[in-house]
Amino acid sequence: MAKKVTGIIKLQVAAGAANPSPPVGPALGQKGVNIMEFCKAFNAKTGDMEKGSPVPVEITVYEDRSFTFETKTSPASYMLKKAAGIKSGSGRPNTEKVGKVTLAQLEEIAKAKEPDLTAADLEAAVRTIAGSARSMGLVVEG
């Protein structure tokens, strides 16, 4: 018989840097999850990723206070900012452009994000990422 799910927690935690301080501690503490157990498991799983990159994680908490978690790829906005070499996107994306990304960079990001995107193929994934880039005030070249 399957365990009964008591809650799902969605967080964004830096790769290899989960610790009991907010936002991780309070979110898990409310559901009665062993915080240190999660932190150790998360840090072990994300140890090979780039340190400090934000990793969305979905934690499923069960009735017996056990948990499972699934990590996703870093947000497209983080990858785009890194590719363009900027700190933040534009406050006015249609009038104020803050950087440039090439089609090759978009393809690279789309390949990395492919497991999390609902796009039918790589071309559709690239178009999705290009739309995100334009909405951040980046110019897409190519």
Swiss-Prot record:
In its record, the post-translational modification comment is: One or more lysine residues are methylated.
Mention one GO biological process in which this protein takes part, according to its record.
translation
Keywords per UniProt: Methylation, Ribonucleoprotein, Ribosomal protein, RNA-binding, rRNA-binding
Matches recorded under InterPro entries: Ribosomal_uL11, Ribosomal_uL11_bac-typ, Ribosomal_uL11_C, Ribosomal_uL11_C_sf, Ribosomal_uL11_CS, Ribosomal_uL11_N, Ribosomal_uL11_N_sf
- GO-annotated cellular components: cytosolic large ribosomal subunit
PROSITE patterns from the UniProt entry: RIBOSOMAL_L11
Please tell me whether the keyword Iron is annotated for this protein: no
Write down the superkingdom of origin. Bacteria
GO function terms (MF aspect): large ribosomal subunit rRNA binding; structural constituent of ribosome
Q: Show the PANTHER family listed in the entry.
A: 60S RIBOSOMAL PROTEIN L12 (PTHR11661), LARGE RIBOSOMAL SUBUNIT PROTEIN UL11M (PTHR11661:SF1)
**What subunit structure does UniProt give?**
Part of the ribosomal stalk of the 50S ribosomal subunit. Interacts with L10 and the large rRNA to form the base of the stalk. L10 forms an elongated spine to which L12 dimers bind in a sequential fashion forming a multimeric L10(L12)X complex.
Function in brief: Forms part of the ribosomal stalk which helps the ribosome interact with GTP-bound translation factors.
Annotated family: Belongs to the universal ribosomal protein uL11 family.
Q: HAMAP family of this UniProt entry?
A: Ribosomal_uL11
Query: What is the name listed in the Swiss-Prot or TrEMBL entry for this protein?
Result: Large ribosomal subunit protein uL11
Q: Which organism is it from?
A: Pseudoalteromonas atlantica (strain T6c / ATCC BAA-1087)
